């Protein structure tokens, strides 16, 4: 078993045991986001400034290692076209739970971000990658793939 498989199983276990980053947003939080009241975390301590995102409606967003039902549902509520890629089955289940509750079908992809991403070149306007790169051995291939799937002028957070 390679280290990314071990990581996925570990994260699955954390989520099953109530891990903070595996608890999906509430219906109330989703509704507030639809009305423009929202905040998401990229790191554990500070909400990302809205200015970093620009207009969200219609923006194609990849949540890279961003399962858990926290950020991607907020972006969806704001009108973005979102895809979430995560290696944790439990994190993707949380995305699906929020989608079912809120009446949309999330685009969930179970994949390893250390491998070539299963998307065409220039597919996304923005990639949102909350704390996850500390769990992998080599960053350069991940950043190279992000550059490939970002549209010209796209943003990686």
Q: What kind of region is each of these model predictions?
A:
Residues 1-31:
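N-terminal, positively charged/glycine-rich alpha-helical extensions of SAM-dependent methyltransferases
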Residues 140-155:
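A short glycine-rich, Lys/Arg-flanked "PGG" loop and its adjoining helix->strand segment in the class I
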């Amino acid at each position: 078993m390679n280290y990314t498989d071990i990581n996925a199983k570990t994260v699955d276990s954390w989520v099953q045991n109530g891990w903070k980053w595996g608890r999906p947003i509430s219906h109330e939080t989703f509704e507030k986001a639809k009305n423009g009241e929202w905040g998401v975390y990229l790191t554990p301590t500070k909400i990302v400034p809205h200015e970093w995102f620009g207009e969200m409606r219609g923006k194609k967003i990849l949540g890279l290692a961003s399962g858990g039902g926290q950020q991607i549902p907020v972006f969806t509520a704001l009108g973005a076209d979102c895809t979430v890629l995560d290696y944790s089955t439990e994190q993707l289940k949380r995305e699906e739970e929020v989608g079912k509750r809120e009446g949309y079908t999330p685009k969930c992809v179970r994949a390893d971000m250390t491998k070539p991403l299963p998307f065409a070149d220039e597919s996304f306007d923005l990639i949102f990658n909350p704390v996850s790169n500390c769990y992998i051995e080599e960053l350069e291939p991940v950043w190279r793939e992000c550059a490939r799937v970002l549209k010209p002028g796209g943003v990686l957070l």
